[in-house]
């Protein structure tokens, strides 16, 4: 330093450091009683009763290629069959049972999924579940440290009616269907073959079109 | 110290940073028209000026420590835009130390550009958090920039805290005084300019 300092210069830096320490103590006091790590329950652990945010799944059949831009190589391929369970442990299966299906893969922390879920929930509430097509949602990419955890509470808050399959911690169901982005939709026809895969937020009209294509009328 | 406590502390500091930046801005703008405010602005410059660049170092150190805490201890994975802000904030620590040591007006002005660059990235990141479709209509399954890890007081997310730090550093560099401290002037215009050479 080549300049003179005022002899009466106020010791701002030490005071600022002291203020940070005091604010730190206030923050510790105010945060007492909350979660130690601020993240809530760990993925897969018991949240309430027998609710688990991730469940083991088993996949039969060949996985679909990853979804990408352009022509979808998965269209016309038989979809893999997935068996697992809902958050409460009830068995859920995505199988070739002769019913067309629309699958919705959701991540609790994804803002686009958080926007899409109320749209679909309201659509079902107003028009009822689509006839002849089964809607199955898959809660995947569940991570306790990420926002809006746990997914079971989120979907309950949103009044979510479709069946939910809780994917495992590795996201095996999502990988089997070639998920590359959220939200992710897969339409399957009555023969269990892929009709269409699409990712991103959909409008009600686009969802209805997807349901119609699963039925084979789109 | 829990993640909750650390985020609350950083939120308190971000609010303080915002208040300081707003106060300096108001005093500087209003001081151009009102002599009484100009005198107050002059006093503020004399108060902050001599140690402003050292305070800027402290702000950069706290912001860097907070960023490292979030990624290394709280395990909040940094996204692409977080990394851009890190690329700006981390080198600011040694750069600002040099500025505080040399106390050269030219260095201060050049260094001011760096936090302003960081602030523009933080501003864009905040916009992406509020309007995720700005980046994409889908979420990257690994780590999208629209993911809000922390939100305090209804608006303070990690990029908002970073923006507050960048703006405070730029403001401190703006008021930092490289010259010896002169006795207070009775002329309000001179007082507003403070010790700017």
Predicted segments — roles?
Chain B
Residues 83:
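Cys/His-coordinated zinc-binding microdomains
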Residues 1-80, 89-92, 96, 100-197:
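Secretory/periplasmic and organellar redox-cofactor proteins
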């Amino acid at each position: 330093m080549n300049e003179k300092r005022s002899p009466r210069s106020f010791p701002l830096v030490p005071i600022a450091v002291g203020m940070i320490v005091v604010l730190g103590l206030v923050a510790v006091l105010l945060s007492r009683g909350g979660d130690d790590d601020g993240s809530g329950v760990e993925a897969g652990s018991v949240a309430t009763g027998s609710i688990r945010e991730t469940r083991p799944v088993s996949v039969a059949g060949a996985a679909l290629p990853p979804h990408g831009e352009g022509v979808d190589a998965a269209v016309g391929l038989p979809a893999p069959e997935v068996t697992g369970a809902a958050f409460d442990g009830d068995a859920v299966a995505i199988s070739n049972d002769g019913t067309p299906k629309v699958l919705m893969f959701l991540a609790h922390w994804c803002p686009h999924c958080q926007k899409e879920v109320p749209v679909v929930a309201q659509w079902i509430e107003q028009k009822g579940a689509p006839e002849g097509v089964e809607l199955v949602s898959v809660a995947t990419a569940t991570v306790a440290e990420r926002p809006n955890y746990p997914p079971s509470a989120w979907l309950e808050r949103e009044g979510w009616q479709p069946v939910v399959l809780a994917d495992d911690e590795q996201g095996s169901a999502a990988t089997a269907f070639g998920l590359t982005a959220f939200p992710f939709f897969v339409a399957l026809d009555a023969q269990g073959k892929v009709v269409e895969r699409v990712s991103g937020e959909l409008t009600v009209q686009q969802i209805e079109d997807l349901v119609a294509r699963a039925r084979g009328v789109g | 110290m829990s993640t909750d406590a650390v985020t609350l502390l950083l939120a308190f500091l971000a609010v303080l940073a915002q208040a300081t930046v707003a106060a300096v801005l108001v005093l500087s703008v209003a001081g151009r028209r009102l002599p009484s405010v100009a005198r107050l602005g002059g006093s503020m410059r004399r108060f902050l000026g001599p140690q402003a660049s050292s305070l800027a170092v402290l702000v950069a150190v706290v912001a860097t420590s907070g960023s490292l805490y979030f990624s290394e201890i709280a395990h909040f994975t940094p996204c692409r835009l977080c990394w851009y802000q890190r690329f700006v904030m981390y080198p600011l620590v040694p750069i600002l130390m040099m500025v505080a040591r040399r106390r050269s007006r030219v260095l201060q002005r050049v260094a001011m550009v760096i936090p302003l660059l960081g602030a523009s990235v933080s501003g864009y990141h905040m916009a992406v958090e509020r309007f995720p479709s700005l980046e994409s209509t889908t979420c990257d399954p690994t780590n999208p920039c629209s993911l809000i890890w922390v939100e305090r007081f209804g608006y303070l997310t990690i990029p908002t805290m970073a923006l507050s730090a960048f703006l405070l550093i730029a403001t401190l560099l703006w008021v930092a005084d490289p010259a010896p401290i002169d006795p207070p002037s009775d002329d309000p215009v001179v007082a507003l300019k403070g010790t700017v050479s």
